[in-house]
Amino acid sequence: MSAPPENLMTESRNPASSHIDTLSTLEMLKVMNAEDKKVALAVELALPSITQAVDLISAAFHKKGRLIYCGAGTSGRLGILDASECPPTFGTPAKQVMALIAGGHRAILKAVENAEDNLQAGQSDLQNINFNENDILVGIAASGSTPYVIGAMRYAKSINAQVIAINCNPNSLMSKECDVNICAVVGPEVLTGSSRLKAGTAQKLILNMLTTGAMIRTGKVFGNLMVDVQATNAKLVERQKMIVIAATDCLREEAEKALLQCNGHCKTAIVMILTNTNTAQAKSLLAKNNGYIRQSIVK
C-alpha cells in the first residue's frame, strides 16, 4: 500500500545538510533554520486548497457535524494537539473536534509497531466513534501513503462524508482519496526521512488554519478576540475580562459586572454592554443570530 520510500520527496536526501554532522553547533542550526524558512512559503502555495477545506469544515459545523483528524505517529499527535485546544480556546463541545491516532491512546507517548500499516484499523476507529456523513475527515500523513489513514479516508468516502488530505508529497496516494488535497511541498528533511521536522511544522501551520478559520466562520471570534474562551483557570478568567473590555471599550468594573451577571459567558457580556440589554435579552439576540456577535449588535 505505501509508496516505496525512494519515490517520496519526504524520504529523499537533502544536499544542504549532507555534512551536517561535521558542522559547529551554530552552523548546524543555521542549516536547520534556513530549511525551516521554506515551510511557511510551502503552506502559502497551498492556500487555495486550505481555503476550500476551511469552507467545508465550516459547513459541516453548521450542520452539527464533527471534524475528525486521523494520522499516525507525529501526524496523529499533531491532530490530537489541535483538537485538544479547541474546547478551551473556542468553547466547543469535547467531541466537535476529535483526533484518531494509529495504535490508539498508547501511541500518543510511545510508538506502536506496525499500527500505521493496518488499513482496516482506520475504518474501525471511525466506526467506533459513529462517524457519519455529516462529519468531515482530515487525513494527515507527511508521506501521503499511510495505510491507516487511507483506510479511514476510503471508509469516509464510502458513506458520502467529505474528506480532506494533508500531505507533503505531490501526487500522493492520499490525493486520490479525498475531496480536497492540501499538499505542502516542503522538500527533503534536514535529517533524511524525519518528517517530524519541516513536514510536521507545515502540518501544524495548516491545522492551525483549519480550526481557526472554521471557528471564525462559525462565530467563535469577534474582531480578533476569542469570545467563546472558557475561563477554566485564573489566567483565563482575567483574559475574559480583557476580551470584554477590548470588544466594548468599557471600564473594567463594567466588564466584571456583566460577566458576573451572565455566569462568565463572554459573548453575552459583550452583547449586553454593546446593546444596553440585560442577560436574557442579550442571550435572545445571540440565539436569533446563531451566536454571531456582529449580527446581534446591529440596530
UniProtKB/Swiss-Prot annotation:
It is an enzyme of class 4 (lyase). It catalyses: N-acetyl-D-muramate 6-phosphate + H2O = N-acetyl-D-glucosamine 6-phosphate + (R)-lactate. Keywords: Carbohydrate metabolism, Lyase. CDD domains: SIS_Etherase. Its EC number is 4.2.1.126. InterPro entries: Etherase_MurQ, Glucokinase_regulatory_CS, MURQ/GCKR, SIS_dom, SIS_dom_sf. Residues 57-220 form the SIS domain. Specifically catalyzes the cleavage of the D-lactyl ether substituent of MurNAc 6-phosphate, producing GlcNAc 6-phosphate and D-lactate. Together with AnmK, is also required for the utilization of anhydro-N-acetylmuramic acid (anhMurNAc) either imported from the medium or derived from its own cell wall murein, and thus plays a role in cell wall recycling. HAMAP family: MurQ (MF_00068). A lyase-type mechanism (elimination/hydration) is suggested for the cleavage of the lactyl ether bond of MurNAc 6-phosphate, with the formation of an alpha,beta-unsaturated aldehyde intermediate with (E)-stereochemistry, followed by the syn addition of water to give product. This is N-acetylmuramic acid 6-phosphate etherase. The gene is murQ.
